Amino acid sequence: MRSVDPTGDVVHAGTFFGDFLPPLARSRTDGALVWAFEPGDENHRASQVTMLLNGLENVILTHAALGAQAGTAVLATSDPAGVPRGGASRIIRNTSLIVPGRVDEDVKVLTCDEVIGDDRRVVLIQLDVEGYEQMALEGAMSTIRRCRPLILVETLPDEKWLADNLTPLGYRITGRVHANKVLRCEGVAAST
């Protein structure tokens, strides 16, 4: 985070209970925003409480998932035995995998590009979305081409997708932060 320009915006998807919101918000200077996304009802409410308790005014928390296109999806919020998944809740891409007894939520899906728009400068996209990272990045490609942000993902997109979409822009995997992979744009300027 220390190498991320404090004057630019951060996109943070998969907020869980909002534990990253205070440090992300406090790392931004005046005018810079944290665009946070959490699709699960309980986790979204917990993130709202975290924002309130910490007086975070530069965070825009959206009750939705990020994906490749706007729409709806099914979020599995418990395992088949009914045990809550918490931060491990995940989008079910194949609806034939919906399991009786498991708690699922219908959630809104938005794209990063449609929410952020062209007037903001994004310096970091941080995705902890339980295997849905590639879909979220697909919906952020205009922002990525325009801003060349640092990208931090829990799960890497598949190799072909990386080669077709991020490698031509100058992105390389340059490190790890715990289990997350760091993708940095090296030597290719952002488009205007």
Question: What name fits each language-model region?
Answer:
Residues 1-69:
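SAM cofactor-binding core of SAM-dependent methyltransferases
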Residues 8-9, 21, 25-36, 111-192:
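Conserved acidic-Pro-Pro-aromatic motif
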Residues 42, 102-106, 152-157:
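Acceptor-substrate binding/catalytic loop of class I
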